[in-house]
Amino acid sequence: MNKLLLLILFEGVIFLSCSGKSGLESGIPKVSLVIDGTFDDKSFNESALNGVKKLKEEFEIELVLKESSTNSYLSDLEGLKDAGSNLIWLIGYKFSDVAKAVSLQNSEMKYAIIDPVYSNEPIPANLVGMTFRAQEGAFLTGYIAAKVSKTGKIGFLGGIEGDIVDAFRYGYEAGAKYANKDIKIFSQYIGSFSDLEAGRSVATKMYSDGIDIIHHAAGLGGIGAIEVAKELGSGHYIIGVDEDQSYLAPNNVITSTTKDVGRSLNLFTSNYLKTNTFEGGKLINYGLKEGVVGFVRNPKMIPFEVEKEIDSLSSKIINKEVIVPYNKESYEKFLKEFI
């Protein structure tokens, strides 16, 4: 689906700018949110949507939502610019290249991107990126998985292999090994964030192989995995991602590795609107310390003593006593140091 959704005006008054004061002098500012895929993914995109919706509690804005796809990124962004958007949010690493391109082409516009994959190259002054230490939250849920697994086998189901999902994977695997060096971990990618059936298929195979807990980071594929866990019933568990996904299968979702995209988006935009200053040209990084990543407490399935251990681990991560790996290289280094 590739349609433009215009939402009603929200309450409040705001002013926009870019690395200084904005050219906006009157009228109601327009904030746009562009995603790859659909807003109803019950995870990443939905979290971003919820974040901008919360702005209505403080500000009067016109919110424009756009569901896009790779072959229409440029035309969609051009349309939003021409429609008068003051700030355009791009949700997901797939927008990394196009975000830099349009920022350089349209210096009068303001852009923000979630999960960009940039190395050390300069970032345009009218672009800001939000990155996350998702591995820190995944470390905690990996620890939980290893502690509560009955079979000694746990799994990881990823979407598209790359920096973003790898952070979840290796954080999860490291946390599990930190809890139990003998735990068996099986990880697999399905090559998509929109293939529900592939997620179902891989999850079914993992459960049949004796894995009793799967952490997913696969978008709709993960929703398929949750469905399978629910259908199979007791003894088949799953760890959600980005948001608390326990409502999808209350008896099977042990916890979720949270990456509060919506909160980070809301924090930055709120400050932007209140101060009339856009702090672009940089990446802003969030983790456990900032309260943006973490895990969902679930006394029903997580023993009290394990939650106490998690609290201690969280402090060690925040204080940098434990440095959580985010890719294969740092994971192998972690194993040599801690396991």
UniProtKB/Swiss-Prot annotation:
Keywords for the protein's UniProt record, in alphabetical order: Cell inner membrane, Cell membrane, Lipoprotein, Membrane, Palmitate, Signal, Transport
Membrane-topology descriptor: Lipid-anchor
Signal peptide: 1-17
Pfam family, any one: Bmp
GO CC terms, sorted: plasma membrane
Listed CDD domains: PBP1_PrnA-like
Cellular compartments annotated: Cell inner membrane
S-diacylglycerol cysteine lipid modification positions: C18
Lipidated residue numbers (N-palmitoyl cysteine): C18
Protein family according to the UniProt entry: Belongs to the BMP lipoprotein family.
PANTHER family: ABC TRANSPORTER GUANOSINE-BINDING PROTEIN NUPN, TRANSCRIPTIONAL ACTIVATOR PROTEIN MED
Function description: Immunogenic protein. May be part of an ABC-type nucleoside uptake system involved in the purine salvage pathway.
Subunit organization: Monomer.
Protein name as annotated: Basic membrane protein A
Organism from which the protein derives: Borreliella afzelii (strain PKo) (Borrelia afzelii)
The encoding gene: bmpA
